[in-house]
Amino acid sequence: MISIRFQGKPFNITVIQVYAPTSNAEEAEVERLYEDLQDLLELTPQKDVLFMIGDWNAKVGSQETPGVTGKFGLGIQNKAGQRLIEFCQENALVIANTLFQQHKRRLYTWTSPDGQHEIRLITFFAAKDGEALYSQKKQDWELTVAQIMNSLLPNSDLN
């Protein structure tokens, strides 16, 4: 787990990178990860915009969880996915890459050599204070991301 904070205007951004234990890990190891992550979140200033990315070894499924996931999650929800959703609910976090449909080539970050298993990097996007940086509407979500990128990179070719 690693965290970095970018100070900027009109807001600061904290990025947290997490790699969760595999499904073979002891429950105590998984709980230790979530406890450490909770401690790190509590150290994050409330006004920061928070991006959390990582390999959670979790499938959140395609059933929408209001305020947390959209209908474009991967696979059938597993135990790790349920734990992840609970953590997000407790901390007002949104699993952003479940909110809108993506091109097939962007669904997976890893596929097993036999093609039977695929892993998707799960990303979050949320304001710690719960302000509305989240929208169920794809166009609103894209607009918010574009506004943030414009603020962060005012002199880039992206604008």
Stretches found by the model and what they are:
Residues 1-159:
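A shared catalytic/ligand-binding motif for oxyanion handling
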